[in-house]
């Protein structure tokens, strides 16, 4: 066997926090990249204390350390796209913005994480939120806020599809190139897609499952993987939405709270073993074989 003909997959970078339960953050991103035949690398913005029951506390990575992680990665590998999640503070948001300005990546997806679904920990401080809104927003290919995140960014109430459309257009006016306002919190999961003056709604099947921990991370990472694989943005969003729906449907009940998605639902069929075979006993112990006469 040799690997001389193996094709190097797109290398995708996630810049986000670490979740010890591995349902969200960089763990969810890396699983999603792998499930889309991409190779993931990560720069960690924070260590969190959390489980499926919620976020207890957040410990931000020093900005100098975050910069060092980013520099080490870009010095070593060719990055095809960047996904940005939790940033924790203005210093880290500024470090990431400088990084994007320096290297001009083709595909950048921002999942603007401000507060956890469960728990009261702050995932981005007020100064950081303002910086994301004023500076980072205009530098990314697409931003994927859920309803509470859209409210944080726009300052308006976002409770239904009509308000989602207004919020999406407002984010475009604020400098975003493209927006997907995700409506997983609604009775009928509907996403609103905005590019320029174009506004579309994408409906989906409602999956009755409490296991949605990391769904936003998975969705944004799936969009990036599709973009890096050659899809146009609209198609990437549709494919990512279908993927997340199935990953929730096939999710795991792990822990006492909201369990994680199953990013690897496509790989559940047992694969034949290649390159592994039983070695006959006589081949293992030649000294024990009877001498020939």
Locate predicted features:
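Glycine- and other small-residue-rich loops at beta-strand/loop junctions that grip anionic moieties
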Residues: 18, 84-85, 182, 212
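Acidic-glycine-rich active-site phosphate/pyrophosphate-binding loop
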Residues: 3-8, 25, 187-202
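Conserved N-terminal subdomain of the carbohydrate kinase-like
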Residues: 2-14, 26, 30-122, 267-270, ...
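Short pre-catalytic strand/loop immediately N-terminal to key active-site residues, enriched for Gly-Thr
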Residues: 15-21, 199-213
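Short, small-residue alpha-helix embedded
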Residues: 151-152, 209-233
């Amino acid at each position: 066997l040799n690997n001389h003909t193996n094709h190097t997959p797109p290398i995708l970078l996630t810049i986000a926090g670490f979740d010890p339960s591995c349902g969200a953050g960089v763990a969810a991103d890396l699983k999603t990249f792998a499930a889309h035949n991409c190779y993931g690398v990560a720069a960690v913005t924070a260590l969190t204390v959390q489980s499926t029951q919620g976020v207890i506390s957040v410990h931000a990575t020093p900005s100098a350390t975050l910069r060092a992680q980013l520099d080490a990665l870009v010095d070593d590998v060719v990055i095809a796209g960047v996904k940005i999640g939790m940033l924790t503070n203005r210093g880290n948001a500024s470090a990431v913005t400088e990084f994007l300005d320096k290297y001009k990546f083709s595909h950048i997806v921002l999942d603007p994480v401000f507060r956890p679904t469960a728990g009261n920990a702050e995932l981005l401080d007020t100064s950081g939120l303002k910086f994301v809104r004023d500076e980072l927003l205009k530098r990314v290919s697409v931003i994927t806020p859920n309803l509470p995140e859209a409210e944080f960014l726009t300052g308006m109430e976002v409770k239904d599809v009509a308000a989602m459309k207004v919020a999406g257009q407002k984010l475009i006016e604020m400098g975003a190139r493209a927006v997907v306002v995700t409506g997983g919190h609604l009775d009928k999961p509907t996403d609103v897609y905005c590019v320029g003056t174009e506004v579309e709604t994408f409906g989906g099947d409602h999956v009755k499952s409490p296991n949605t921990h990391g769904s936003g991370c998975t969705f944004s990472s799936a969009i990036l993987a599709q973009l890096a694989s050659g899809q146009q943005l609209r198609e990437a969003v549709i494919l990512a939405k279908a993927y997340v729906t199935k990953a929730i449907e096939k999710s795991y009940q792990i822990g006492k709270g909201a369990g994680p998605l199953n990013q690897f639902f496509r790989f559940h069929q047992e694969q034949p073993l290649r390159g592994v075979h039983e070695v006959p006993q006589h081949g293992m112990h030649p000294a024990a074989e009877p001498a020939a006469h």
